[in-house]
Amino acid sequence: MPTTIDEGLPAPHNFVSFTTLIARKYQNLIEKTISFIPQRWAFVGFLSFLYILRVSLSSGGWYVITYALGIFLLTRFIAFLSPKWDPELEEDSGDSLPTTLNRNDDEAKPFIRRLPEFLFWHSIFKALFISIFCTFIPFLDLPVFWPILLLYFIIIFSVTMKKQIKHMIKYKYIPFTVGKKTYTKNNS
């Protein structure tokens, strides 16, 4: 009988079973963190601090890695702010059958995100972890003129956020909610 690792699982005999075991343990650990929202985001903040500290204290600039991380985080943030079903696309499709006779555009509709909060957090966590790892690989510190990357990122950020805010105003949705509104009984 092969030796066992914790939880009574058989010891891995080859690389595939070892990676499967690691993937299962990672998935189990990630799933245990679902209900700990403030702690998860605090850990992402800590990873961000570690990344900034690593980049600022190292001899290289890591400009390309930082730029790629910024662009990735921007795309994830836009997906987090976007509704799952784009009202602009639904408006254009005139071939579908109407579901109600009188359609009220002021009707309250729930906001469902294209990228849920947990997946948003998980993608940021993985991106920061990979970025920190990449700063330990010397050949990834490419020599670039960083002000151009910074200017380009600022332009991309401002254009995409302006477009997203206009979309939010046009279709009257607010992606930031704190939950269901509760009413209290007034004793006076």
From Swiss-Prot:
Coiled coil: none annotated. The keyword Lipid metabolism does not apply. Pfam families: Rer1. One of its GO terms (cellular component) is Golgi membrane. InterPro entries: Rer1. GO terms for biological process: protein retention in ER lumen; protein transport; retrograde vesicle-mediated transport, Golgi to endoplasmic reticulum. It is a multi-pass membrane protein. Its main location: membrane. Keywords: Membrane, Protein transport, Transmembrane, Transmembrane helix, Transport. It is found in: Membrane. The chain crosses the membrane at residues 33-53, 61-81, 115-135, 136-156. May be involved in protein transport along the secretory pathway. Belongs to the RER1 family. This is Protein RER1 homolog. It comes from Dictyostelium discoideum (Social amoeba). The gene is rer1.
